């Protein structure tokens, strides 16, 4: 597939920069913000459904191929929660409230039952009605700490223990995180599918 530019279905400048770095220079990512500030309602019941919904919407708005990601944290003890509701886990009150709610939900839960994984699904559509979106999933396994640790990252990063580095994901520098994360793992697969390896 020969793509020179994609619209990223996100208004988040940090995510645009992170994904552009992972994608490399042969494909230019543009923000959907160039075309509309309206975000679609995420009505899907899975990461896959929401990623496809966002990609189709961005392609419809821009007339260009579009890439979307839907990501979140799935905690084993909580049956996969907060899952697709990760960003709104504490009713839209932000990262600190989400982290506090998660710590409260896992209060007194021992380390061996605090397994979790960050999940990322990337969906690429060639056009808004693409019958066969390209889907790539990345998982990053770890566990939830009892207290926040680290200054980098965002979201649940300060609570997510990375066993292969013996630290939280918020203690990893951006370049190291961009090699290990769920989003990085999904992007490796997408680059392969696009023939960019």
UniProtKB/Swiss-Prot annotation:
One of its GO terms (molecular function) is dITP diphosphatase activity. Binds 1 Mg(2+) ion per subunit. Substrate binds at residues 10-15, 71, 154-157, 177, 182-183. SUPFAM superfamilies: ITPase-like. It catalyses: XTP + H2O = XMP + diphosphate + H(+); dITP + H2O = dIMP + diphosphate + H(+); ITP + H2O = IMP + diphosphate + H(+). Its EC number is 3.6.1.66. Keywords: Hydrolase, Magnesium, Metal-binding, Nucleotide metabolism, Nucleotide-binding. InterPro entries: dITP/XTP_pyrophosphatase, ITPase-like_fam, RdgB/HAM1. It comes from the Bacteria. Disulfide bonds: none annotated. Its cofactor is Mg(2+). The active site is at 70 (proton acceptor). Pyrophosphatase that catalyzes the hydrolysis of nucleoside triphosphates to their monophosphate derivatives, with a high preference for the non-canonical purine nucleotides XTP (xanthosine triphosphate), dITP (deoxyinosine triphosphate) and ITP. Seems to function as a house-cleaning enzyme that removes non-canonical purine nucleotides from the nucleotide pool, thus preventing their incorporation into DNA/RNA and avoiding chromosomal lesions. HAMAP family: Non_canon_purine_NTPase (MF_01405). Belongs to the HAM1 NTPase family. Homodimer. PANTHER family: INOSINE TRIPHOSPHATE PYROPHOSPHATASE, INOSINE TRIPHOSPHATE PYROPHOSPHATASE/HAM1 PROTEIN. This is dITP/XTP pyrophosphatase. It comes from Pseudomonas syringae pv. tomato (strain ATCC BAA-871 / DC3000).
């Amino acid at each position: 597939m020969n793509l020179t530019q994609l619209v990223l279905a996100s208004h988040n400048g940090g995510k645009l920069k992170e994904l552009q770095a992972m994608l490399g220079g042969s494909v230019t990512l543009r923000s959907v913000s160039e075309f509309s500030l309206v975000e679609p309602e995420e009505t899907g019941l899975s990461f896959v459904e929401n990623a496809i919904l966002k990609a189709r919407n961005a392609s419809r708005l821009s007339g260009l191929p579009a890439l979307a990601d839907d990501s979140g944290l799935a905690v084993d003890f909580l049956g996969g929660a907060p899952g697709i509701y990760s960003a709104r886990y504490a009713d839209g009150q932000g990262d600190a409230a989400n982290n506090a709610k998660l710590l409260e939900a896992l209060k007194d839960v021992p380390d061996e039952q605090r397994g979790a994984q960050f999940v990322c699904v990337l969906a690429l559509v060639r056009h808004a009605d693409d019958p066969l979106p390209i889907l790539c999933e990345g998982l990053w396994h770890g566990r939830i700490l009892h207290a926040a640790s680290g200054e980098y990252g965002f979201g649940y990063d300060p609570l997510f223990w990375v066993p292969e580095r013996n630290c939280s994901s918020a203690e990893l520098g951006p370049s190291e995180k961009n090699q290990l994360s769920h989003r990085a793992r999904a992007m490796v697969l997408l680059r392969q599918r696009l023939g960019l390896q």
